[in-house]
Amino acid sequence: MTLQLPNDPARSDVLSARPTLWINSLYRDDAIGDTCLPLVPDQVDVAQSDWERLAPLLETCFPELKKTAGAIRSDLTELHALREALGYGGGEFGRVFAKADSALPVAGSIKARGGVYEVFVFAEELARREGLIGDREDIRHLASAEARAFFSSYSIAVGSTGNLGLSVGVAARALGFEATVHMSSDAKPWKVERLRKLGVKVVQHEADYTTAVENARSAAEDDPAVYFVDDEQSRRLFLGYSVAASELVDQLQTFGVAVDADRPLFLYLPCGIGGAPGGVTYGAKKVFGDNAHCFFVEPVQSPCALVHMMSGSEELVSVYDVGLTNSTEADGMAVARMSAFVATVMRNMLAGVFTVDDASLFRWLLLAHEVQGLRLEPSAAAGFAGPGFIVKHPQGRAFCERLKLSDRLRQATHVVWTTGGSFVPQEQFDQFLEIAQASRSR
C-alpha cells in the first residue's frame, strides 16, 4: 500500500530519509492514567516483585549475577568528557548521562530485561502448574537436574533481528528448554553463531524482521509444547523492560539528581518494534510522572514508530508504505512495522521520535569508545542525538516552549539509553571502528 503522510514539519525530512525530529501532537499529561489502555501501572509493581522472587534462581543460573544477588542491572554514567565531544558542553544542555544497558549481564543488551524475564516467568508458571514446585519450595529448584529434564520436553520460540533472540536463547538454554530463534536477513552472523554454540536452533529467513516473527508464530502455534515469545504483542516482555525505570530512580538520586517540574528528565530510547523503549517509557511515566519526557530514536530508513504515529492510521503502517527501504547497519532497529500493542500504549505517552543516519551512528560509536570507553554496537549509539534535537532543533525548541520547559533546560537531565554492544566480538567491534575512522578521514 502507498500512504500519504499528513502535513507536518517533519514530513519532508522523513520522506527524504533525512535526520529529523517529530513531535507527537497527542502527547498529554497523565497519559498513563488512561483507563482504556490494555494494562495498568500496578502491573509494573508485579513485574518488580517477579524479578525479586526470581533473583535467587537467576543467580544460580548465571554466576555473573552473584555480585548483584541475581539482579540484572546496568550502570548510570555521567558523560562529562563525551558531552563536550558531542557538542553538548554548554550549560543549556543540563546534565547528560548514559544508561549502559549495552553492558547488561547475561545477554549484553536491553533485551535481557524483557527476554530473560519472560522466559523465567513462563518457566515458573509452567513448573507450578505441573506440580514441579510447590508454593513454599525454593525457587532454585528450577535449576535442578530434575527441572532441566522436565523443561527439556518444551521449546521456546522467538523471531528476532538478533538481540532478543540472544536474550531468549540464553535464558531458555540456562533452564534446559529447547530453543528456536527465527532470524531476519538483517541479523549479524556473530549473533547467529553465538546462539548455535549455546545449542539454540537458528532458522534464518531471507526476509525482514516482520516476516521472521510471522514465521516463528506460525511454526509455534500448532504445537502445545512450544511457547512463543511474541515481540509484537507480549505484555510480559513490555513489563520486564518497564522495571528499569525504578532502577534509574535510585541511580539518579546517587548523583544528586532530582526530577520534578523545575528539573525535567529527557530519555532517549533506540526503537525497533517498540517493546523495549515502550516498556521503559511506561515505567518512567509511572515513577517520574509528567516530569519525564521520552523520545524514541530510529534510523532514517526504518522509522516505523514515527511513520505509524505520524500517520494517525488505525491500521499499522510500514516504512515501505512511504517509500523507505528499511535498510540500516543498526540491525536491532531494522523493523518496518511497529507493534500495535506498543502503538496503542504510546499514543498519548510518547513525546516524539527523532531519526538518525548510519554515518552518525558510527561517528558516535567511535567517540563513545575513544572518549568515554564505551563499547557499543551502532544501534546503541542512536540516542546521542537527543540533547541536540531538544535544545537546538526548531521542533525541539517549540516543544520546550509549549511545555514551558525552555527556562528549565539548564536544570534538566538527559539520559541516553545505550542498548547493546558488550557481547560484540572484538573482530566485529574493530570493523565498526574502522568504518567510523574511514568516514572521519574523508
Curated annotation (Swiss-Prot):
Q: What reaction does this catalyse?
A: D-serine = pyruvate + NH4(+)
- SUPFAM superfamilies noted in UniProt: Tryptophan synthase beta subunit-like PLP-dependent enzymes
Q: What broad class of enzyme is this?
A: lyase
Q: Which cofactor does it need?
A: pyridoxal 5'-phosphate
Q: Which domain of life is it from?
A: Bacteria
> Residues where N6-(pyridoxal phosphate)lysine occurs?
111
GO biological process annotation, one example: isoleucine biosynthetic process
Q: Which UniProt keywords apply?
A: Lyase, Pyridoxal phosphate
Q: What is its EC number?
A: 4.3.1.18
Query: What are the GO MF terms of this UniProt record?
Result: D-serine ammonia-lyase activity; hydro-lyase activity; pyridoxal phosphate binding
Q: Which family does it belong to?
A: Belongs to the serine/threonine dehydratase family. DsdA subfamily.
**Record protein name field:** Probable D-serine dehydratase
